[in-house]
């Protein structure tokens, strides 16, 4: 499992390296070009947690030490739940931060407002709960609302909002949401890809981290 997560994390590492070395051609807000420090915050659930956990090690191995990372985590959290927690300013999240390629726990009772407002984040990565990742109707109006809130809280008004595309459940998974996709990994993956394409186009998100495709191609 650790090897799988390391492989999936290459997508996040690629985002960091490309942002540090190249300019995005058509961003919703420009990714910074060769910044002195790159700041990336992931807002999500275990898929964000798993997707970023080993990133400091990959950055360290690549000799990159000017990246600040944050992961704001609540188990199974959907776009709708993020918005509901924020409306109540509820301290539901665990907030981890890496400033020298080493994770530390900032808070085990953080709010969305606190974590997003903690740094001048350059990139804000969001995702949908895996259970609903292939269900188009679960995204609206919650994705638009979450984007609006993280933009409001972020001290960097020009932060780029990016999308993490989650992966499909494996064959034989006993996840309670798998029947939504007829217990078929290929059907779920196709739905996730299709919905990700639609909602990112609708919301102007042009930076997509394809962890779902990375896992699918293992």
What do the predicted segments below correspond to?
Residues 28, 70, 85-105, 173-188, ...:
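A broadly tuned preference for mixed-charge, low-complexity surface segments
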Residues 47, 73-76, 168, 215:
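Residue-level detector of flexible, active-site-proximal loop/helix-junction positions
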Residues 4, 8-10, 37, 106, ...:
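Homeobox/homeodomain signature
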Residues 25-28, 80, 163:
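Short low-complexity stretches enriched in small and charged residues
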Residues 109-218:
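Alpha-helical cap/lid subdomain in secreted, periplasmic
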Residues 1-71, 174:
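N-terminal secretory targeting modules
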């Amino acid at each position: 499992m650790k090897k799988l997560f390391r492989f999936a994390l290459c997508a996040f590492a690629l985002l960091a390296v490309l942002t540090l070395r190249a300019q995005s051609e058509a961003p919703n807000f420009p990714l910074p070009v060769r910044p002195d420090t790159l700041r990336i915050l992931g807002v999500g659930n275990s898929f964000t947690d798993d997707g970023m956990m080993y990133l400091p090690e990959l950055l360290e191995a690549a000799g990159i030490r000017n990246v600040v990372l944050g992961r704001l985590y609540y188990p199974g959290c959907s776009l709708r739940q993020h918005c509901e927690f924020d409306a109540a300013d509820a301290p539901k999240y665990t907030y981890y931060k890496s400033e020298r390629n080493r994770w530390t726990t900032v808070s085990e009772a953080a709010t969305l407002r606190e974590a997003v407002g903690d740094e001048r984040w350059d990139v804000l990565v969001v995702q949908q709960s895996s259970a609903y990742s292939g269900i188009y109707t679960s995204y609206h109006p919650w994705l638009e609302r979450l984007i609006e809130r993280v933009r409001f809280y972020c001290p960097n008004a020009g932060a780029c909002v990016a999308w993490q595309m989650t992966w499909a459940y494996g064959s034989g998974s006993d996840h309670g949401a798998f029947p939504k996709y007829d217990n078929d990994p290929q059907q779920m993956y196709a739905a996730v890809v299709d919905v990700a394409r639609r909602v990112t186009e609708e919301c102007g998100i042009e930076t997509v981290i394809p962890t779902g495709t990375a896992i699918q191609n293992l």
